[in-house]
């Protein structure tokens, strides 16, 4: 069985992603179109059910106009 990604630390990271999206005024659908991903992917990322790699995080940071470090503090 795989290790759960639902740690408190990862949930905090996922919460920051959602908060950043809301601060930009974008919907999950709008983000999904800009990142060329399904809306369900954005939902899973924000729920902490889908991990991101470093390049994906960079793409979110650029879209949300946030410094990369905002998400990993």
State the predicted function of each range.
Residues 13, 44-47:
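Anionic, Ser/Thr-rich low-complexity intrinsically disordered regions
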Residues 22, 33, 62:
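Alpha-helical residues within the helix-turn-helix
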Residues 55-70:
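DNA major-groove recognition helix of helix-turn-helix/homeodomain DNA-binding modules
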Residues 2-23:
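A short, Lys/Arg-rich alpha-helix, primarily the initiator
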Residues 25-44:
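Short alpha-helical DNA-recognition segment
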